[in-house]
Amino acid sequence: MSRVCDITGQTKSFGNKVSHSNRKTKRTYLVNLHNVTLFSDVLNRKFRFKISSRTLRTIDYKGGFDLYLLETSSRKLSDKAQKIKKMIKKATAENVKVSL
């Protein structure tokens, strides 16, 4: 079971534990992951992810799962998230053609 965010690909980071006497020892910072189900309004479908708390807060801030994916650059997204982003773009393009 890898500790990687399914949307952003965020993994553990490294740093130092600093004591009161300023002695430094190496340590790792693990990602705070949660199993969540996110709903896509455009696709009318649910997706299950294991995502970090930071990503979940960002999704809420952006206004939902669909808007988060559309506003985030593809370089910052994992392969799975990029595929869903393409599906959302395709669905919105089809909806625009139908409404015209």
Curated annotation (Swiss-Prot):
Signal sequence interval, chain numbering: none
Alphabetical GO biological process terms: translation
Gene Ontology cellular-component annotations: ribonucleoprotein complex; ribosome
Keyword Ribosomal protein belongs to the record: yes
Pfam families xref list: Ribosomal_L28
Matches recorded under Gene3D superfamilies: Ribosomal protein L28/L24 (2.30.170.40)
Protein keywords: Ribonucleoprotein, Ribosomal protein
Top-level taxon: Bacteria
Matching PANTHER family: 39S RIBOSOMAL PROTEIN L28, MITOCHONDRIAL (PTHR13528), LARGE RIBOSOMAL SUBUNIT PROTEIN BL28M (PTHR13528:SF2)
UniProt family annotation: Belongs to the bacterial ribosomal protein bL28 family.
Protein name as catalogued: Large ribosomal subunit protein bL28
Organism: Ehrlichia ruminantium (strain Gardel)
